[in-house]
Amino acid sequence: VQRLETRPLAEALPVQSTYDIFVNSAAAFGDKTALTFLPTADPAAEPIRWSYAQLLTGIHQTANLLHHLGVGPQDAVAVLLPGCLEYHLALWGGEAAGIVQPLNPMLTDEKIAAMMTLARAKVLIAYGSEGDLGYWSKALRLRALVPTLTAVLRVAPHDEAPGAAPALPAGMLDLAARHQHPGDHLVSGRRIVASDIAAYFHTGGTTGAPKLARHSHGAQVFTAWGSVQMQGIRPEDVGINGYPLFHVAGVLPGSLAALSAGVETIIPTTGLFRNREVIANYWRLVERYRCTYLSAVPTVLAALANVPLGGADISTLRYCRTGAAI
């Protein structure tokens, strides 16, 4: 702490926005793997990987698609997705174009619709399959419940066969339409400053109706930077991020901090830590991907403590991090 305090914050942290983070990471790490998606929890299964350069291209394309749909810096983009690569396009492309609003799919339609209406969500990015939580049918119902919505973007499942996508009615597009937009710059020409609002995150709703908390770009950038400094995160690190991305733990320390530092971040199936097979195979996944740190909430750590190593080599792990409300 004393070492960090010897430099003014503006000098130590010149980055203004989450968008700047991804521009810098793509320049620094290029073809290095940024995100690894595991279609199943089987350690032998072939993963899907995106490099830092590919991730920035996708962020540009997504932001430009949203801009084309009328999203501006004051407009909210709601997100209803499981664990998937495209969640990162929705998050960071949404923040580059407007204000992202990640949503917990386990909340009732009424609670989600109320939050979207409060945020005046203009676009909803939703998973185009039922999955285990009825994503697509919920998205269709929300479309009728939220008066401010002008468009719904469908995210196809990773294993959807060519030509199997359903016909979409007016006002609905496949997120793959992003490929029709430039991937090397923001068409809007937006210059994001630290005080701009980046996201609306909702509280858990355990003490009544969920409430919206505003995140500025500067606050998210500082949180990511602080995590990197405190934990000594470095480009050779590899971590499994099994948190849901409607939760700040999954988005800020679990994703933004790692992706600002050149880390390979693993997305363990669409079910994340809710997938029992991910927990059962966790130590074998650590061995397969040579993970260097373990990150989970206490309930997940308790579950992992009951999973035998089964001969898995986990010697690459350097530390464990956790956190919880008390």
Language model feature labels by segment:
Residues 63, 82-101, 105-109, 117-123, ...:
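A short helix-loop-beta submotif of the ANL/AMP-binding
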Residues 56-62, 180-185, 194, 198, ...:
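Conserved structural elements of the adenylate-forming
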Residues 107-142, 223-240, 275-291:
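Conserved ATP-dependent adenylate/AMP-binding module captured primarily in the ANL superfamily
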Residues 14, 31-84, 88-91, 108-113, ...:
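Conserved AMP-binding/adenylate-forming core of the ANL superfamily
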Residues 126-138, 270-272, 289-326:
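Adenylate-forming
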Residues 95, 221-238, 246-292, 301, ...:
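Conserved AMP-binding/adenylation subdomain of ANL enzymes
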Residues 99-175:
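Structural core segment of the AMP-binding/adenylate-forming
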